[in-house]
Swiss-Prot record:
Pfam families: HSP20
Localization in the cell: Cytoplasm; Nucleus
InterPro entries assigned: A-crystallin/Hsp20_dom (IPR002068), HSP20-like_chaperone (IPR008978), HSPB9 (IPR042940)
Domain sHSP: 36-147
Encoding gene, per UniProt annotation: HSPB9
Biological source species: Homo sapiens (Human)
Protein name: Heat shock protein beta-9
């Protein structure tokens, strides 16, 4: 009888269809500025502009634009809101930190350089971006070579 052992690596791994792309994306973190949006007809038009792209609205009531950090890390969007609250009473002063984090995976065809982020007066954080058109694969003239190889392997298994 032979004993089989398992070994585990402490090395961090990136789950990706293409490992080299995953490693390259891991090191690209961009922080987007959060601007305060005023209620105006132009703001509504700007909101309608995102119909053909990515749009996410988040409740950020109580946070100021400078308390919000919006980052794009590869295909992930991360929104962090952090506040320091002073609690004062006659006997002492104390501080309390409040932090909220939201993570969302972005569409693969989203252009991170074309993203905008704004905070409405009502406390809604809008993150928007334009999606680029994906190139369609060229039409093939005949059976797919992969399907053919799967068929031959399947027939070998039934023998």
């Amino acid at each position: 009888m032979q004993r089989v052992g398992n070994t585990f690596s402490n090395e961090s791994r990136v789950a990706s269809r293409c490992p080299s792309v995953g490693l390259a994306e891991r090191n690209r973190v961009a922080t987007m500025p959060v601007r305060l949006l005023r209620d105006s007809p132009a703001a509504q038009e700007d909101n309608d502009h995102a119909r053909d792209g990515f749009q996410m609205k988040l409740d950020a009531h109580g946070f100021a634009p400078e308390e919000l950090v919006v980052q794009v890390d590869g295909q992930w969007l991360m929104v962090t809101g952090q506040q320091q609250l002073d609690v004062r009473d006659p006997e002492r002063v104390s501080y309390r930190m409040s932090q909220k984090v939201h993570r969302k995976m972005l569409p693969s065809n989203l252009s991170p350089t074309a993203m905008t982020c704004c905070l409405t007066p009502s406390g809604q954080l809008w993150v928007r971006g334009q999606c680029v058109a994906l190139a369609l694969p060229e039409a093939q003239t005949g059976p797919s070579p992969r399907l053919g190889s799967l068929g031959s392997k399947a027939s070998n298994l039934t023998r």
